[in-house]
A protein has these predicted regions:
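C-terminal accessory "lid"/substrate-recognition subdomains
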Residues: 173-179, 184-312, 324-327, 335
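Nucleotide-state-sensitive switch-loop elements of NTP-binding domains
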Residues: 27-33, 38, 42-160
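C-terminal engagement modules used by replication, chromatin/transcription, nuclear envelope/ESCRT
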Residues: 313-321
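Conserved C-terminal guanine-recognition region of P-loop GTPase G domains, centered on the G4
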Residues: 123-124, 130-145, 150-205
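Short, positively charged and aromatic/hydrophobic N-terminal segments
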Residues: 3-18, 22-23
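Short, conserved catalytic or adaptor-binding loops enriched in Gly and charged residues
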Residues: 76-80, 170, 204-208
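Short, hydrophobic beta-strand segments that form beta-sheet elements in well-ordered domains
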Residues: 59-61, 286-289, 320
């Protein structure tokens, strides 16, 4: 089939989709952001359950940084008649990713959802979300509901310029900001995190300063009344100075498949690796490994903690995410 005929066929299909979609009510769409390891997926499980308990039919769109989506596996227990999971893999250029995102939203727009939740990676250009939703026909199908940002209550006091930019860009438009692990943080750590957020906003010339929008509660402590409030908080349209992260080439993700390493040894090696400056600036390590009994274990490592917990299903992959990563050095810890 010629390129012209393919385009003509696509135009006919899209026109029919628009006609069918026009008969349905607009779908609310939420964006839930958070820097690497902040606890987005944990929060989404609780938020999705809250929406399901209200009788809503929801779709969750997972978008990971890189070609393998680990978080998709962590949300599988939500799947059912009223909750479906979709995925966009990263590992592609900006324009390709935007096209995939738009195409996926067009498909999901025909599913009759009451609400769609978008969970991007911890390294995400928030402008993509708003820009795509202003494209035709999505601007007539979707209505932006909430922008929710998850921030670790024990946020590192010093981050790179690029990392601070991501932090600010994710917080600038948020209607609600949730401090994850707040129950583990001291009052001083929480106040330092809020100061860091506002300092990051100032650095990108954003006039917004955060205080009342911040819920100083961990996701596990949020009540139904708290979620009622979050559901109504919406988002804020703020301006700030943009940074082209692609030009910086600072953030990387490395994948290690089918490692011949025990769960205990993996946890030990990851702890050493994250302390080794020769490996680069590692923000997050996540993935799955089998224990001695053949059961799946979930690895989750940040600068604050390293956990290894049982999980029903997994995939033999470990993902390392950070800045200026040195693959050869990291490989020595994981493969030797």
């Amino acid at each position: 089939m010629s390129s012209f005929k393919k385009l003509k066929k696509y135009a006919i299909i899209l026109k029919e989709v628009k006609n069918q979609r026009g008969k349905l009510a607009m779908v609310k769409i939420d964006l839930i952001t958070g820097f690497l390891g902040s606890g987005k997926t944990t929060f989404i499980k609780k938020y999705a359950k809250y929406l399901l308990d209200k009788g809503m039919n929801i779709g969750i769109l997972e978008n990971d940084f890189g070609a393998v989506n680990v978080d998709m596996l962590l949300l599988r227990d939500l799947m059912g008649d009223n909750c479906e999971l979709e995925m966009i893999s990263g590992g592609c250029d900006k324009e390709t990713h935007r096209r995939r995102f738009r195409t996926k939203l067009i498909a999901m727009g025909m599913c009759g959802y009451d609400r769609v939740i978008v969970e991007p990676s911890g390294i995400y250009d928030v402008d993509e979300f708003f820009d795509v939703l202003h494209d035709e026909p999505l601007d007539k199908w979707y209505e932006i509901g909430n922008v929710i940002t998850i921030v670790d209550a024990k946020l590192e006091p010093e981050l790179s310029e690029e990392a601070d930019y991501l932090l600010a860009s994710e917080a600038a438009n948020a209607g609600s900001i949730i401090l994850s692990r707040a129950e583990e943080a001291t009052k001083e750590q929480i106040e330092n995190t809020i100061e860091h957020l506002n300092r990051a906003l100032e650095q990108v010339q954003c006039k917004r300063r955060l205080d009342q929008e911040i819920m100083r509660k961990d996701g596990a402590e949020l009540s139904e009344e708290d979620f009622d409030k979050i559901l109504k908080n919406g988002y804020v349209a703020e301006n700030y100075r943009k940074m082209e992260l692609d030009e910086k080439k600072g953030f990387d993700s490395l994948y290690f498949m089918e490692l011949k390493i025990s769960a205990d040894e993996l946890k030990t090696q990851v702890a050493k690796m994250m302390q080794d400056p020769e490996c680069g600036g590692i923000f997050r390590v996540k993935g799955f490994v089998k224990d001695d009994a053949g059961s799946w274990m979930q690895l989750n490592a940040t600068g604050h903690e390293i956990s290894m917990k049982p999980i029903g299903d997994g995939q033999e992959v470990v993902i390392v995410i950070g800045e200026q990563l040195k693959a050869d050095c990291i490989r020595k810890y994981l493969e030797n």
